Regions:
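Conserved functional micro-motifs across diverse proteins
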Residues: 19-156, 160-205
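Sec-dependent bacterial lipoprotein signal peptides
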Residues: 1-19
Length: 205
């Protein structure tokens, strides 16, 4: 084997090792990693006077949040994480650009309009969310609107979609066609490269 071939082979071996090597994190580090603004799992879209923050929530993230970010042992963590497979979940936070007013109250003309807005989020908005999974078009399997009652400057939609796979093997693109504030179609995509990063993370208990 000549020197050039030997060098190429060595580089390929190093690449393969780096692809399979696990990156260790504590639960706190994992949480920060998933929630990082500007990271691959948290997307922010500004549309008119509103800001939509779309947070992808992997199974381990959900399981850890349910357990207040503290597991008794790794078996408990793995069992709950596996049970959450097959459905992808997102938190969609809806706020105003100014941050001074809750979206339900922003420029509202009165109680009747406020109630119409609230009713939309409670009973209609789920129909206007779509998840594009490769060439598949999926509608929500779970939807909850978390009303802050104007106590803070944002409200939250929790929304889930059932996949044909246990874990995503195609990019995820969440779209919301706004029928309330006329801000158009809101899009947030989680790329396959980003999703594959999760395979190389080892969370320590």
């Amino acid at each position: 084997m000549n020197k050039v071939a030997s060098v190429i082979l060595s580089v390929l071996v190093l690449i393969c090792l780096s692809c399979t090597e696990k990156r260790e994190m504590t639960l706190a580090q994992y949480r920060n990693y998933i929630e990082a603004k500007g990271g691959g799992f948290c997307k922010t879209v500004t549309a008119g006077p509103l800001i939509y923050t779309v947070q992808y929530r992997p199974p381990l993230y959900i399981a850890a949040a349910e357990h207040k970010w503290q597991f008794n042992d790794s078996t408990e963590m793995k069992t709950r994480t596996m049970a959450l497979g097959g459905i992808v979940w997102f938190n969609v936070r809806i706020g105003t650009v100014s941050g001074a007013t809750n979206p339900l109250k922003s420029d509202v003309s009165g109680v009747a309009e406020y109630n119409d807005r609230l009713n939309y989020w409670l009973t209609q908005a789920a129909n206007h969310f779509t998840l594009y999974y490769g060439d598949l078009e999926l509608k929500p399997q779970g939807y909850v609107f978390e009303n802050s009652y104007g106590l803070i400057s944002e409200d939250v939609v929790v929304i889930g979609f059932r996949l044909p796979d246990t874990t995503p093997v195609r990019p995820l693109r969440l779209e919301y066609e706004d029928q309330l504030y006329n801000t158009g179609i809101i899009k947030a995509e989680i790329s396959m490269d980003v999703l594959q990063e999760l395979d190389h993370i080892q969370v320590k208990i």
